[in-house]
């Protein structure tokens, strides 16, 4: 429930839902330093407790906001899909009809990504590059001994992917404006 995610609260937080008692019991321990009593930890865990006010906000948003946010993001992403169909320079994410896809970010894959981003920003569009370094080239993955060229698809996506606003506050006219700008750029 990071402030920038689809369902957010007034800070960082989260929840896990499961119908598996074994998993639930383990997670319950992990969220509170593995404590089984005030002074005894069964396992090493984390401080992952949500404070009361955050929990109240999260509970309210789950009950009253999630469906609306989800529907709006799906609607926005489908409009982008439809409008980009006529631009051969823009590749969108493949959709799977049997899945309910709710976009946190709407990625397009384009040549001249960085130039397009600067152009969109100059026109007040919040275009961002997310994930510019593929996982296998991250410092944390160095021990795996992968090198540039080992995952060419991931590397191409890292070079060409651009995120454009798809959140629930984006209006239809805003989406059409963004698409028009991108069409004009190419």
Where are these predicted regions, by residue range?
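PLP-dependent aminotransferase class I/II
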Residues: 19-186
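Active-site phosphate-binding strand-loop segment of PLP-dependent enzymes
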Residues: 3-9, 15-17, 22, 112
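Short hydrophobic "helix-edge" motifs at membrane interfaces and signal-peptide entry regions
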Residues: 9-11, 155-156
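Conserved active-site segment immediately N-terminal to the catalytic lysine
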Residues: 1-10, 37-42
């Amino acid at each position: 429930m990071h402030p920038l995610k689809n369902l957010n609260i007034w800070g960082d937080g989260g929840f896990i839902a499961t119908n598996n008692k074994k998993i639930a019991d383990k997670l319950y321990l992990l969220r509170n330093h593995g404590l089984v009593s005030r002074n005894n930890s069964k396992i090493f865990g984390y401080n992952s407790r949500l404070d009361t006010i955050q929990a109240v906000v999260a509970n309210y948003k789950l009950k009253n906001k999630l469906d609306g946010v989800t529907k709006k993001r799906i609607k926005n992403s489908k409009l982008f899909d439809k409008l980009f169909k006529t631009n051969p320079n823009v590749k969108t994410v493949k959709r799977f009809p049997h899945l309910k896809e709710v976009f946190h970010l709407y990625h397009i894959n384009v040549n001249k990504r960085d130039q397009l981003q600067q152009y969109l920003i100059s026109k007040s569009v919040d275009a961002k590059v997310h994930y510019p370094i593929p996982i296998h080239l991250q410092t944390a993955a160095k021990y795996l001994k992968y090198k540039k060229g080992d995952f060419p698809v991931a590397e191409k996506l890292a070079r060409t992917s651009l995120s454009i606003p798809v959140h629930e506050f984006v209006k239809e006219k805003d989406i059409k404006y963004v698409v028009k700008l991108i069409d004009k750029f190419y």
